[in-house]
Amino acid sequence: MRILISPAKKMRVDGDSLAPTALPRFLEEAEILKNALTGLTAEERRRLWECSEAIAQVNEERLRLMDLFHAVTPAILAYEGIQYQYMAPGVLERKQLDYLQEHLRIGSGLYGLLCPFDSVAPYRLEMQAKLKAAGKKDLYDFWGGKPAEQLAAETDWIVNLASKEYSKAVWPHLPRRVGFISCVFG
């Protein structure tokens, strides 16, 4: 079984609490997307990010400093959304962290699919963003079936806790043998 969750918009760098154990599996694709972002003007990025000028400035700096191959924060600590706060990975014991590493997967506009201890750099790129990269019209087109194929290679059952935005990147591409149970919170 794998549990699929969405990332959070707010991110942080934490190189002290827990160390990442791996690079994201779709790092080459993330590099393509990073290059597509840097190929846009600052105003085009702000429109793509759909954010205020202040938030755009923070993310401009993050993009300028981004080193995908030497990030120091594990994904489980990088996101600051409410689900990550309540998961409280900073206080979990080793056995619990190992369970998360085996069973939890995080959808990502930039990285495609992450394990909790994959190293990530702070970024802003939602799956629904209309970023054109590698001849593809948007991120759904860019990622295609890669996240779903990876999940299908790992399990026969997915518990979907992700938003529609992120589950849409997985569900249509799964083989029929993989069960997909969605939990709707409302």
Predicted ranges, named:
Residues P89-G186:
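Internal, well-folded beta-alpha domain core
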Residues R2-S6, W157-N160:
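Short hydrophobic beta-strand segments
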Residues L4-V91:
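Active-site helix-to-loop segments that bind/position phosphate- or nucleotide-bearing substrates
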